[in-house]
Amino acid sequence: MSSRARNDLTEGPIFNKLFKLSLPIMATSLMQTAHSLTNMFWLSWLGEGYVAAAGLVTQFIWLSMSLIIMFRTGAEIGVAQNMGKREPEMAKAYAQNGLMLAVVFGTVFAVALILLRTHLLRFFDIESEYLANIAQQYMAIVALTVPFNFGHFVITGIFGGYGNTKLPFYINSAALVLNIALTPVFIFVFDMGIVGAAVGMVVAAVFNFILKIWAMTKYKNRPFEKYALIVKISWDRVAQILKWGVPVGAELLLFTTLFMVITRLITSFGESAIAAHQVGMQIESLSFMVASGFASAMTAFIGQNFGAGKWARLRTTFRVSYLFMAGYGAVISSVIFIFAPPLISIFLSDPHSIGIGVSYLRIIAGAQFLICIEGVATGSFRGRGQTMKPSIASISCNILRVILCYALAATALGTSGIWLGIAITMAIRAIWMLVWHKLNIRKHPMADAIVAD
């Protein structure tokens, strides 16, 4: 079978193709979660302050993800839709312009994080000078991962749009295993503490980026036969990448910014609340990281079929995807709720911190089912180039989240009020997206379009 046939998502059994496409992405998401949990575990041996410091810095790395997702989404949609239209040269132009922009912006962002880290961390109004110092140390090193993350995430999107998610999965897995192996060595054997955890992340990010550059230029099943890393900028392609990607990037940027506002509220309840929240979020990512991964696979799958005008195939894909993610969501929601105490106890030992963490997981568990099936609607909208719709729903609910969290935290609920505000707005956003998607797909034609080979 030719490379093109293997990666053509417009023909063949829908579930098999979608499952094979999505499984590596979801597995990568689970490995990233495992990696984050492993880092938290090792840092917890140094003390809860180290867990809290790493969690605070991570939120600035999330800010960089708003730009990463912007370029990745634009490149992935451009590649997927043009491969569906049988226009590989146009697909390559999106891939090249997206990658170049990502690396440039990633470098600028990293420099800004390093130079401004002291001022940026003051946002959280950290009372402990000790906690502020170790957070600054960690941030100075972790910021070096950003340009490489920009590059390798966009390449992953390019491969996804092409229909090959296996190779990025293998490379991501190798990088994550390397990071997991190096972290305890740098922390304990070389006695580098939290700086050691950051150095391990840098080494893994560089390793990941180098291997993916090799994959784009040398691997036998690469998306494009001839791929130049540096080309003349095509401003038309750049404009379209930004048109698709800016709504997604703005959504994540505002989400992270508003979440940092909520984190500042959490810091007012003390170091235990910060640590419990950070650990709880990592455990919770078993659902939202997988939902995000499935949404990414849906973007590529829907993108190719949308480009090919396969309307009947699109509708079947929606039904299959909702059933699959509903099953996963039901399982993970139950696990998080039932096993909250032992899960939190792996990372925290203080009874007060454990109690706060268990409260977080049990309140948030009810929304995880909806979050999982929401990923289907999100990926569908993005694959069809309608990136504005998920962004509108997300931004609106994130603004509402801040209002609810502050209002409920001021009551006798305390931190539980914050967790409740987060869960309620998660549910509202998911229901909004599912209803909007149901209404939107009714507008598609019933008969398939004809796309010439």
Please provide the spans of the model-predicted regions.
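Helix-terminus/linker motif at the lipid-water interface of multi-pass membrane proteins
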Residues: 30, 34-52, 121-129, 185-192, ...
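Small-residue-rich hydrophobic transmembrane alpha-helices
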Residues: 51-111, 149-168, 263, 276-340, ...
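Short runs within selected transmembrane alpha-helices of multi-pass transporters and secretion channels
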Residues: 72, 141-160, 168-179, 197-212, ...
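Alpha-helical transmembrane segments of multipass membrane proteins
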Residues: 37-41, 154-158, 177-185, 213, ...
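Small-residue hotspots at the loop-to-helix junctions and early N-terminal turns
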Residues: 48-59, 139, 198, 271-286, ...
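N-terminal transmembrane alpha-helices
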Residues: 9-41, 45-46, 62-74, 103-110, ...
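Transmembrane helical elements of multi-pass membrane transporters/channels
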Residues: 20-39, 141, 152, 204-208, ...
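Short alpha-helical transmembrane segments in multi-pass integral membrane proteins
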Residues: 1-22, 79-145, 189-246, 302-367, ...
